[in-house]
Design a protein with these regions (language model features):
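Conserved beta-strand elements of the Class I
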Residues: 22-23
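Mid-chain, well-packed structural core segment of small domains
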Residues: 67-107
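A short helix->loop->beta-strand "cap" motif at the edges of active sites that frequently abuts
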Residues: 46, 97-100, 120-122
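Rossmann-fold NAD(P)-binding glycine/threonine-rich loop
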Residues: 106-134, 138
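Short gly/ser/thr-rich secondary-structure transition/capping motifs
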Residues: 2-7, 58-64
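Short N-terminal or domain-adjacent regulatory/targeting segments
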Residues: 1-17
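NAD(P)-binding Rossmann-fold cofactor-contacting core
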Residues: 27-32, 38-59
Length: 139
């Protein structure tokens, strides 16, 4: 089943109704978007799984080194890495059966990788901030 790009608020609302978010590039540094946005999501009831090979602890837990290492079931992969790393992250996501949505934060996009994910039946949201969309659609 070919998934189409996510464009409607109804689709975004449905995605924001999912529970578990693996955050690739999650930061241990307060003040950085890659820390503050996942923190906001955690505070709003999501299970946030930090992925960062260089940090010892984020949000009171040890982060995974990569998406491939995550033992929990993942609904959404939220990407806080440069656009040129998106393709590899999408490859990792497509190796997993559990990932329903790949979401790249503001300023991050790779259309070719997005098309591959959609061809595999995954939903893709590019170049949007999950916190902004949550505030706008869920409150």
């Amino acid at each position: 089943v070919l998934a189409m790009p996510v464009e409607s608020d109804a689709e975004l609302r449905e995605i924001l109704g999912l529970e578990t978010i693996a955050v690739v590039g999650c930061s241990a540094t307060p003040g950085k978007d890659a820390h503050e946005i996942p923190k906001y999501l955690k505070e709003h009831g999501y299970e946030v799984i930090p992925i960062n090979p260089f940090a010892d602890e984020i949000f009171g837990r040890e982060p995974y080194d990569s998406l491939a290492d995550v033992e929990e079931a993942v609904d959404i992969v939220d990407v806080f890495r440069p656009s040129d790393e998106v393709a590899g992250i999408v490859d990792d996501a497509l190796e997993r059966d559990d990932v329903k949505v790949i979401w790249t934060q503001l300023g991050i996009a790779d259309d070719e990788a997005a098309e591959r994910a959609e061809a595999d039946g995954r939903q893709v949201v590019q170049d949007k901030c999950m916190k902004v969309e949550h505030q706008r659609l869920v409150g």
